[in-house]
Amino acid sequence: MAAVPQLSAPSAPARSADGILIGDRQYSEVYLTIDYSLIPEERLSPTPSMSDGLDLNTETDLRILGCELIQSAGILLRLPQVAMATGQVLFHRFFYSKSFVKHSFEIIAMACINLASKIEEAPRRIRDVINVCHHLRQIRAKRTPSPLILDQSYINTKNHVIKAERRILKELGFCVHVKHPHKIIVMYLQVLECERNQTLVQTAWNYMNDCLRTNVFVRFDAETIACACIYLAARALQLSLPNRPHWFLLFGATEENIQDICITTLRLYSRIKPNYEFLEKEVDKRKVALQEAKLKAKGLNPDGTPAILSMGGFSPASKPSSPRDVKTEEKSPNFAKVKREMDDKQSSKSPYNGLRKENKRSRSVSRSRSRTKSRSRSHSPRRHYNNRRRSRSGTYSSRSRSRSRSHSESPRRHHNHGSPHMKLKHRVEDLRGRHAHKRKKSHSPSKSREPSELAKKHRHEHGHHRERRERSRSFERSHKNKHHGSSHSGHGRHRR
């Protein structure tokens, strides 16, 4: 008979302070127990809201308002008391991690209601939660209740509630389990043989519901809170309970913790009812102050513009010269001389074989004169004053057109001129010298038609277009009688 192999049970993984050792690898572990839902004493003060500038009384009033909103909305939504209690505990836990200044307590309260209804298996639609909170807000403001309009504001509020619900889960590490003392109260009263006293049971239950507005649910466990509620109810109804030894020692509670819970609960009844408008203004002030502090730390003004530092940095007075100074320097008498020297240096390095721009312009003048009459007429721009462009000879009219066109391309220069008679005399002599020089030399485009002296004169000449046309007409009339009969190679091209 074959032997049956024995199956050995797998060995339990070895635990250590750093995690769980499985095989030759070590893995981390996460403990999800109710003990981790209690906040240690060092985190109770200062809270994040107090770090942002809110005092303890204002924060306590905001906690009370948020819990009252959750309780009232839960009643209208017909939620079980366990779901409403879970929502209030989640509300307290969240605001020990975040500040009332940075998060709206109304949005967080609606998110806690929505999340608690899912946890306690009594889900409600988020639309119903928003409508109920809107109705309670109108009643608190003493206004006539009106239905919520499904506009963009409603969509924004809905998105804020959904995001706040995810934020609560993230801040609490998805540890949203809450252990409530409701059943524990009934169980302890059965041990004390007082379960038939309905007044005692209901009074202890009421104290427990009122404790939800305080922070005792995040400081003590459910068994201690149940003992404190029974202790308060017995004292209020003047009922005697075993005290030798004290009855609460049987359930693991201490006298110091019970006294602390009782004092915290009784202080709740002595507080003035919080004013919602006043608390909202206080939170808005702290928001503005916090925003200004952030902008100041970044070096910005409250309106978002960059702040000008008194020491160092850029200063408008540190500029070497203002734009007005530059304009006056350009108009100085030395500026033209310096600019001319700079043009000479640039002309020597220009790609025009060492020729200046003025010489290139004179070459364009000679090219325009060598064109045919038909081409010069087709390319010449039409002007509205045709009576002034008429001439007796087509040869000189084409030359005057090309000459006026080439002169119009030259830049304007503002200089002081002499009398009109002297200007006309110099103009006639200049044109005679040009005409005699053009007869001697060929009309090849490779050479310049004007000597350097005429180029310099042409550079300094300036006048309006009308004056130039008048001068050319007077020259044509006086020069036609002398050279009309002479034949010229350049003029022969324009004859038909």
UniProtKB/Swiss-Prot annotation:
PANTHER family: CYCLIN
Residue span of region Cyclin-like 2: 183-267
Domain of life of the source: Eukaryota
Keywords from the UniProt entry: Cyclin, Nucleus, Repeat, Transcription, Transcription regulation
Name under which the protein is recorded: Cyclin-L1
SMART domains: CYCLIN, Cyclin_C
UniProt function note: Involved in pre-mRNA splicing.
Basic and acidic residues compositional bias, start-end: 322-347, 469-478
Annotated family: Belongs to the cyclin family. Cyclin L subfamily.
Biased composition (Basic residues): 358-392, 412-426, 434-446, 456-468, 479-496
GO CC terms, sorted: nuclear speck; nucleus
Alphabetical list of SUPFAM superfamilies matching this protein: Cyclin-like
Chain residue ranges for the region called Cyclin-like 1: 68-170
Subcellular location: Nucleus speckle; Nucleus, Nucleoplasm
Region described as Disordered: spans on this chain: 301-496
Originating organism: Xenopus laevis (African clawed frog)
GO MF annotations, alphabetized: cyclin-dependent protein serine/threonine kinase regulator activity
GO biological process: regulation of transcription by RNA polymerase II
Sequence segments annotated as region (RS): 363-406
